[in-house]
């Protein structure tokens, strides 16, 4: 006979870290060319003027300027960068 009681093991107890998605630069904030503005899965927010779209759908500034979030029609959003005056 076993001299220790058999102890079951749980198959839970794991969780992956978050992916740090979301807004990195907010409306009205100054950005330099190459600064990441928004990290996302899919085009939740579309690229507007002077904003590039990375292969993982990251939005980034193409010029130095100020961030502005805008609406595209009824249900879509875009982010643009306009030169600071």
From Swiss-Prot:
The UniProt record lists the keyword Cell division: no
GO BP terms, alphabetized: translation
Gene Ontology MF terms: structural constituent of ribosome
Recorded GO CC terms: cytosolic large ribosomal subunit
UniProt keyword terms in alphabetical order: Ribonucleoprotein, Ribosomal protein
Zinc keyword on record: no
Gene3D superfamilies in the cross-refs: 2.40.50.100
Classification via Pfam families: Ribosomal_L27
Span list, region Disordered: 1-21
InterPro entries recorded: Ribosomal_bL27 (IPR001684)
Similarity comment: family membership: Belongs to the bacterial ribosomal protein bL27 family.
UniProt protein name: Large ribosomal subunit protein bL27
Organism this protein belongs to: Citrifermentans bemidjiense (strain ATCC BAA-1014 / DSM 16622 / JCM 12645 / Bem)
Gene designation: rpmA
């Amino acid at each position: 006979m076993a001299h220790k009681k058999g102890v079951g093991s749980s198959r839970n107890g794991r969780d992956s870290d978050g992916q740090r998605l979301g807004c990195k630069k907010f409306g009205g904030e100054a950005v330099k060319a190459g600064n990441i503005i928004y990290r996302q899965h899919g085009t939740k927010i579309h690229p507007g003027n002077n904003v590039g779209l990375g292969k993982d759908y990251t939005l980034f500034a193409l010029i130095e300027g100020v961030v502005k979030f805008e609406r595209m029609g009824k249900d879509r959003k875009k982010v643009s960068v306009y030169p600071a005056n």
